[in-house]
Amino acid sequence: MSFSMVYDTLQVAKEHILLVAIIGVFLIHLLRLLAPPTIKNVPTVRYSNWLPDFVNRILYYPYAISMIEAGYYKYKDRMFRMITSDGEVYVLPMKYQKDLRHLNLSKISSLDAQYENALGDYTHILLNTTLVSDTIRKRLTPSLSRLVPRVIDELVRASSTVLPETEKNEWITINPNDLFNRLIGLSSARVMVGDALRHNEEWLKASVGYAHCLGITMVVLRPIPKYLRPLVAPFLPSTWEMSRSVRLAKRLFSPIVNERRRAAEENDPGYTKPDDFLQWFLDLGVEEGEILPAAEISQHMLLLVALAVTHTSTMALCHATFDLISRPEYLEPLREEIHRTLPDGWHLGTQAAFLDQVRLDSFLRESQRFAPPGDLSFHRKVMSPVTLHDGVVLPKGVHICFPAGAISRDPTFVQNPLAFDGFRWCKDPKDRYALSPELAKSALIDQTDNKEDSAPNAPSGFVTVTATNMGFGYGRQTCPGRFFAANTTKTILSRLILDYEFRFAGGKDAKRPPNTCIGEHILPNLTAELEFQKKHMEF
């Protein structure tokens, strides 16, 4: 073969190779376009791209709120991956809410996400049953009307010790975190287990202490690599204390559970079933064929009371009380409403009366908007692949959530969102403009504005869950205990507003103690002190 023939052959081959390469690139690009989108290439939000991720994980604690806000506005219609203190979460845009809101536990699980968030391997969190949430939804919430008098009765008893009588012009100094933990612990104990343990000091201390130690354990262990946690956790005093609380719960509850089961099996004619959460839990377990060991039920009761009842309600009450002191102009309109809805006095309050307190309800919602339990909500672990409406596939095992805090502060959805407007969620003009009666008289409501806070038909309650109000979650697995928590919160706060003057310790010039932000969580200042003075008047 001559040199010219070889040259011509190479030229033809070169042209073919170039053509094949062009076709190959086109096909690869076409396949990428046709393939379902994945989450592998979503943008990542971290404190600094110049720092190693173990440093970014530690910096998540003080800077998470600002990072979530920045990610939300930078990638508003896109998913982004956030480096957290112990891993990563995928923060989703609002356009995926409808895709996910109705999915059940087999597809996306709030229980598994909670277990992961709370480091369940080291904190005694259980996720083996939905009986707790089922009992709340099917038994507790429908029973609220008959439970309110019991809660009030217990609060009356508790107030005499935690809020003693004062002489005229005398102020007493109290830590509000301790005050509300005590009030909620005593009142909820009666609802949860009746007379058996409601005044048991060991139980009250254990339920409060467990939540405190859980928080410490999470903060310490999360930045530590997962393979080192089994070596570190056993040496933490907080894990020792949690283990003691679990052992105590089993020692106190197991005999009660066993005795109730024995009485039910023997059909003892002299036995009357208690009307409390523990009994409803046992009965529902029988109905659904899910008979749990007594020790396991004891642990569930500890987790329920410590985390779902006492801790969350205490945080809400602290924030709301701080907000009231910071904005005293709201006190008189609230007192007027409480007097109107409780004409026979607070001690004879009913569920219907507390539901009618729309101003207080709105104030609590606004307080929660400024200081939600967490700036991320709808935490779910994907249990099996989920395909979203635009073809994006969420693979099994990823942790997803929505930027609830940033959404609630978005001017697209809330008018003038950076201003605290305690009555913005009221519908009736006389309540909405209680601070400006001249506006209420003229009923100046802008019907053309479709933002949530001014839309006349928009859901507005403290416990209302919407696409822009996710303080209690969203969708099928929304917090079922929010109705009981809200009712207890309003019961306690209405008593304080009616019966007491309160202020920050340190005099008239004292300012609202700054919140404590730990990662996505926004806590009130737990060391702050308030001064209380009993009003010397009858109501």
List each language-model region with its residue ranges.
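N-terminal membrane-proximal hinge/A-helix region immediately C-terminal to the signal-anchor transmembrane segment
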Residues: 2-132, 150, 468
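Conserved cytochrome P450 K-helix/beta-meander segment immediately N-terminal to the heme-binding cysteine loop
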Residues: 402-459
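Hydrophobic, well-ordered secondary-structure elements that form the walls
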Residues: 367, 397, 420, 475, ...
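Classical protein tyrosine phosphatase
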Residues: 313-336
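C-terminal helix/juxtamembrane-tail motif
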Residues: 1-12, 519-539
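Cytochrome P450 heme-binding "Cys pocket" and the immediately downstream C-terminal segment
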Residues: 330, 452, 464-465, 476, ...
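Cytochrome P450 heme-thiolate monooxygenase catalytic core
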Residues: 149-315
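Conserved cytochrome P450 K-helix E-x-x-R motif and the immediately C-terminal K′/meander segment
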Residues: 62-69, 344-392, 398-411, 459-462
